[in-house]
């Protein structure tokens, strides 16, 4: 499979979407401003990166889009813990700091769901039909995990997917089924997004939870009252996407591959309390 062709074709069809100030789904406009930077796939780091255009190397980078000087200038403002605003700021798991709108050294790049009308003739559920062409859904190799999401192409660190979709519920007793809901905390408001109904959710509902810390390659975070998933480890072709669904992330013990139990890192303000899968 031609990775370059896949990426470029996908970007041309869907546009470039990167979380931005006040709107994690904002599209960076193509303007007449000076463009001294490039958004690239960095082969060395296996990650989305921002570099100066003069340093672009076809052997090291796959170019995605030009970025204007103004676009880059607004990135990476460090925010103290006390000044954090969930509608403006995103926590960088690499730097362990808050940035507005996100970290410039470890930028985010949003891939949208496949947009379509409900097809009554399709054998696939609506949530399965929202799957981007970068993935496929098939039986997971994890024991008793059911269906899972598998990468068709290399997926770099920094890619963002979402938001997680489903029914908005006020209490757990409203869930259709356990294991598919995230708790959203926004100021004094608390509510759940229940993705158990495959006809009212999206493809993110099929992403399974890892058995061990080392298996996790995605991280869930909340911004603007919505849940997004971001890639924190490079995902190879035919590798399954895995995100932690702990009922009390940061406080519960998890088991490593060697059988030892330890506590997960406590600081991750964007992980929401979700029902375990």
UniProtKB/Swiss-Prot annotation:
GO terms for biological process: methylation. It catalyses: N(6)-methyl-L-lysyl(4)-[histone H3] + S-adenosyl-L-methionine = N(6),N(6)-dimethyl-L-lysyl(4)-[histone H3] + S-adenosyl-L-homocysteine + H(+); L-lysyl(4)-[histone H3] + S-adenosyl-L-methionine = N(6)-methyl-L-lysyl(4)-[histone H3] + S-adenosyl-L-homocysteine + H(+). One of its GO terms (molecular function) is histone H3K4 methyltransferase activity. Residues 135-246 form the SET domain. Its EC number is 2.1.1.-, 2.1.1.364. Expressed in the germline. Predominantly expressed in primary spermatocytes. Also expressed in the oocyte-producing germline of hermaphrodites. Gene3D superfamilies: SET domain. This is Histone-lysine N-methyltransferase set-17. The gene is set-17.
